[in-house]
């Protein structure tokens, strides 16, 4: 049995992505831009989103973190997501779960444009994953499968 060194694998992936981002810039193409949405200030969610923003910075991606109060209405959160869906500068959207109890995770996930759903949670992307078709894969299960 071989033991996987997660730190080394992570660094190798980051190094590869840095090269790809540099190639995009050299070719005059747009640098990928992740929009992360954090509702409330739950500790584990803060840590996870901060790690994503840091990872973006390390590889040369742009990132935008939108922090919203835990009391935001579902309607207002859906409006924020729609703005991100239609913003041509945003390539990927991550809404950190869990959401406050008064907001439906399912409605929020459904509102994310499947082409910008970096978690792969949108029903269209989940269906493509089950069928073995190209799609975004949720990071943790994908990492385990590697």
Predicted feature residues:
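Positively charged, low-complexity intrinsically disordered leader regions
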Residues: 1-28
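Glycine-rich loop at the start of a catalytic domain that most often binds anionic cofactors/ligands
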Residues: 46-53, 79-81, 106-109
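Short beta-strand elements in bilobed, periplasmic/extracellular small-molecule ligand-binding domains
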Residues: 56-71
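Glycine-rich phosphate/diphosphate-binding loop of Rossmann-like nucleotide-binding domains
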Residues: 39-54, 135-146
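Non-catalytic terminal and connector segments of soluble metabolic enzymes
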Residues: 58-60, 83-86, 112-115
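Short beta-strand segments enriched in small/hydrophobic residues
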Residues: 31-40
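Anion-binding alpha/beta catalytic cores of soluble intermediary-metabolism enzymes, centered on
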Residues: 95-146
């Amino acid at each position: 049995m071989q033991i996987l060194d997660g730190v080394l694998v992570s660094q190798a992936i980051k190094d590869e992505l840095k090269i790809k981002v540099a190639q995009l810039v050299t070719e005059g193409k747009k640098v990928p831009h992740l929009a992360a949405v954090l509702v409330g200030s739950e500790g584990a969610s803060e840590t996870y989103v901060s790690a994503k923003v840091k990872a973006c910075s390390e590889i040369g991606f742009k990132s935008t973190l939108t922090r919203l109060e835990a009391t935001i209405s579902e309607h207002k959160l859906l409006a924020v997501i729609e703005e991100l869906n239609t913003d041509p500068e945003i390539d990927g959207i991550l809404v950190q779960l869990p959401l406050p109890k008064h907001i439906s995770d399912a409605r929020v996930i459904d509102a994310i444009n499947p082409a910008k759903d970096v978690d792969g949670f949108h029903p269209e992307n989940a269906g493509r994953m089950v069928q073995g078709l190209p799609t975004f894969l949720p990071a943790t299960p994908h990492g385990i499968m590697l």
